Amino acid sequence: MRFSGRFKGYNLQKFQKDLIAGIVVGVVAIPLGMAFAIASGVEPEYGLYTVVIAGICISLFGGSKYQIGGPTGAFVPILFGIIMQYGLENLLIAGFMAGVMLVLFGLFKLGKIMKFVPKPVIVGFTAGIAVLIFTEQIANFLGLRNVEKHENFHHNMFEIVQQLGTFNVYAILTAVIGLVILLVSAKVMPKVPGALLALLISTVVAVVFFPDRMATIGSTYGEIPRHLPEFQFPELTLDKMVMLFPAALVIALLGGLESILSAMVADNMKGSKHDSNKELVGQGIANMAAPLFGGIPATGAIARTATNIKNGAVSPVSGVVHGVVVLLVLLVFAPYASHVPLASMAPILMVVAWNMSERKEVANMLRLKNADSFILAATFALTVLFDLIIGVATGLLLAFVFFIRRMSEATRIHNQETHPVLAKREDPSVSMYAIEGPLFFGSIDSLESSLLEHVQKKPKTLILLMNKVHYMDTSAEAVLGNIMNRIKRHNGKLMIVGLQSQPKELLHKTGLFHKIGKQHFFDHHDEITG
């Protein structure tokens, strides 16, 4: 049994490895799929639909052989906010639009650009999402009643505090049993899917010893149907697309970033190399397909991808198997899921939040007490207090500002008044400066002030040593042109030594090279004669 193309060299032995890995990760995905759906504000079956449809598509069309896709914790606060504001139908439309965007991102080769998001921003918003997921489950863990959900963190926390008196002892016992099983199984039986084990045991305990004493999936959302929903293309109108564009863009950007991070984790574990652009296309196809069958937005799941690799996966077939396993469980066991207490789901999500919180990274970066610490803290705080969009946008803006500041400080301008060339000329109207570092909009202020000051003192000839300037933008080019004009008004001249390829190309394109004059450019200062 051999296949060509992507599965070249594939055989029965490899399929057996993929089958085992796919079954294990499929079992892991079942409780997580339901839990993430509930946390996002939709019925649990939508999470399972997503695992099946999006999970299979991501494996078949993505750029990583080991990627496992589906609903993830990172999406929870985003999807919950969209549900609160626009409703489920519009969430599905936003997910479809995000899929189209992701395909376009991949086709326009934007995969590598997504890797440029600074680490403090990633750690900050990931930790912020973890806090939101964890705190959102406090009500289910304690079995609180009549807790209304709000878009803002502080409103939700105030609501929980107000309803603390409605706690349910049976729900707390059920949640604690699930939490203990999760923690113990991770230490004692690391290869056993702890989430499924905790879900099953805590549910059985609740059904046998505390029947009808707490909220369940059935009492809250109704019975899960034993089939996929019918194919239904979303009703797209221009007004809806304009309204949902910001939400779709956030889903696309977060989904793309999360999927590439997950693929990079897989690369580190297997020594492989994923195709970022193909991964974005695969994620896009998955997010276009999932809403057609009731699925919510999906992305690469780091923990499930790692589980896939640890259990011997060798190809995308394992991801397909994982989707098929979830589908079979959905078709056979769906009615039994109505008995699962919400208190059994809460510790699963709390542990997911704890594991994704980047605690060590946060502590290490905050200890640095530098720009990265400030960016992380700002991104984290704004993600929690407002939303992911504000948090990430502010984090990126701060990172940009600090980067410009660092780069501008890296530019140095040195007066070369003792240079041998000046000593030979013995002309007091000639000055020479050596410039080091990039010349761009962030460094032009010091460039202009330094050079113009000396142009006024020695207006005849200015020699610039630029062999250590490897980048120049149009802002710096404009300053250079201004300096040249000042010198020419005094019948002087500007000479440039050691101009590198990128600045030279820029000066040619803008015409400044011709205005300065070819005869005033030198490869080495020894060539200066006039």
UniProtKB/Swiss-Prot annotation:
Keywords: Cell membrane, Membrane, Transmembrane, Transmembrane helix, Transport. The keyword Secreted does not apply. It is a multi-pass membrane protein. GO terms for cellular component: plasma membrane. It comes from the Bacteria. InterPro entries: SLC26A/SulP_dom, SLC26A/SulP_fam, STAS_dom, STAS_dom_sf. One of its GO terms (biological process) is transmembrane transport. The chain crosses the membrane at residues 19-39, 41-61, 68-88, 91-111, 121-141, 164-184, 192-212, 241-261, 313-333, 384-404. It holds the Pfam family Sulfate_transp. It is found in: Cell membrane. The keyword Glycosyltransferase does not apply. Residues 420-530 form the STAS domain. Belongs to the SLC26A/SulP transporter (TC 2.A.53) family. This is Putative sulfate transporter YvdB. It comes from Bacillus subtilis (strain 168).
